[in-house]
Design a protein with these regions (language model features):
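Active-site-proximal loop/hinge segments that shape catalytic or ion-binding/gating pockets
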Residues: 1-50, 56-164
């Protein structure tokens, strides 16, 4: 895509319908997320940008532990916390008693002091990767991994790019 602005999925629906159509496919089988409300931010699940504090290198290592090798190198934006903290951000930290489709009413204020908590990949995630690999199904990379959600768009022009 041309440009340097990172938009939430729903913002692409009218401005870039072909890109929206490509990325909305990620929700096949989980369509209820497309209309799920994030009450603290007064918006929908796809009205926000989704971030993780987990490094792309660690994601690859955890996938490899599950027997999944990613043969391509991908680029990821490293977004400074200062850009996403504040009233337009929230953390979604999965609770152990939740199903594959989480209770989207359980959020906590995004706290930069808790980055170590947000960086932790739960053992359940690695087990999930193993189960999906064994069944020949593609895993959701961020299943049970804490999410940092930001209501807004971000200019990526001056952001560091991390390859993994």
């Amino acid at each position: 895509m041309d440009g340097s602005i990172l938009y939430p999925l729903n913002a692409l629906k009218n401005s870039h319908p072909e890109i929206y159509a490509e990325h909305v496919k990620k929700y096949e089988g989980r369509e209820q997320l497309l209309t799920a409300e994030i009450q603290p931010l007064k918006c929908l699940w796809n009205d926000v940008l989704h971030f993780t504090a987990v490094s792309p290198q660690e994601l690859k290592v955890n996938l490899a532990k599950a027997g999944i090798e990613i043969g391509i190198v991908q680029d990821w934006y490293k977004v400074p916390v200062s850009i996403i903290q504040g009233e337009n951000s929230i953390a979604f930290v999965y609770r152990r008693d939740q199903s594959v489709i989480p209770n989207l009413k359980e959020y906590e204020t995004f706290d930069p002091e808790k980055m170590e908590v947000y960086r932790k990949v739960p053992e359940e995630t690695i087990e999930y990767y193993k189960e999906r690999n064994a069944s020949g199904k593609r895993p959701l990379l961020f299943h049970i991994v804490p999410h940092i959600l930001y209501k807004g768009s971000i200019d990526t022009k001056n952001l560091e790019i991390v390859s993994a």
